[in-house]
Amino acid sequence: MEQMDAHQIISFIQNSKKATPVKVYLKGDLEKIDFPSDVKTFITGNAGTIFGEWAVVEPLLEANKANIEDYVIENDRRNSAIPLLDMKNINARIEPGAVIRDQVTIGDNAVIMMGASINIGSVIGDGTMIDMNVVLGGRATVGKNCHIGAGSVLAGVVEPPSAQPVIVEDNVVVGANVVVLEGVRIGEGAVVAAGAIVTKDVAPGTVVAGIPARELKKLDAKTASKTEIMQELRQL
């Protein structure tokens, strides 16, 4: 999938059909209810479950109060513009609780851990691990064989469209609870220490730390050993 630019994302959101889907468990004299074709029904006898848009389901429930003994509604969004990514055929390990929106590219053997939030237009390279509770903003790009530590935030940009998103090149290790501001590029093989706030570009093969992040040294054998990417964790 080709990465979307900001104007394409804005157009996608603007033109998308906004959705408020609901799931309703109900019981009663359901055979007397004429369910419209755009409501999916899974009903046996006097109980069942229906799925549909709230704009359709709400008047249906109201019009059939006499035939419905009780019901419970589940709803997790309102006028949502972007659906979640269909993950069934992605060649990656994606753990429960990750929230990944549509139009995200995920490379082969990538790992997305619990609680990660990945916004529209983001790109995750082959073999990259996105750890727990990481946030990838819109259009944020992470290269191959990287590790983005738990709780880190890579700023994304949809508006203003002229701004640039974060770009992380290949073989980068980002520690836990790092914040990388919009427009920053982290060069290949760099290491960002935990808790850093990265406000400017990071040169390839360097180690940075602090608030704001500053270069400490060039990547050496000791640091490389401590930040080794384990391919065993990426096998499917």
UniProtKB/Swiss-Prot annotation:
Protein name: 2,3,4,5-tetrahydropyridine-2,6-dicarboxylate N-acetyltransferase
Highest rank taxon of the organism: Bacteria
Disulfide bridge positions per record: none
Lineage: Bacteria, Bacillati, Bacillota, Bacilli, Bacillales
GO biological process: diaminopimelate biosynthetic process; lysine biosynthetic process via diaminopimelate
Protein family per UniProt: Belongs to the transferase hexapeptide repeat family. DapH subfamily.
Pathway assigned in UniProt: Amino-acid biosynthesis; L-lysine biosynthesis via DAP pathway; LL-2,6-diaminopimelate from (S)-tetrahydrodipicolinate (acetylase route): step 1/3
E.C. number: 2.3.1.89
Catalytic reactions on record: (S)-2,3,4,5-tetrahydrodipicolinate + acetyl-CoA + H2O = L-2-acetamido-6-oxoheptanedioate + CoA
Gene Ontology molecular functions: tetrahydrodipicolinate N-acetyltransferase activity
Residues in coiled coil: none
InterPro entries assigned: DapH (IPR019873), DapH_N (IPR013710), Hexapep (IPR001451), Hexapep_transf_CS (IPR018357), Trans_hexapeptide_repeat (IPR050179), Trimer_LpxA-like_sf (IPR011004)
Alphabetical list of PROSITE patterns matching this protein: HEXAPEP_TRANSFERASES (PS00101)
Broadest EC class assigned to this enzyme: transferase
Keywords: Acyltransferase, Amino-acid biosynthesis, Diaminopimelate biosynthesis, Lysine biosynthesis, Repeat, Transferase
Pfam families in alphabetical order: DapH_N, Hexapep, Hexapep_2
Annotated function: Catalyzes the transfer of an acetyl group from acetyl-CoA to tetrahydrodipicolinate.
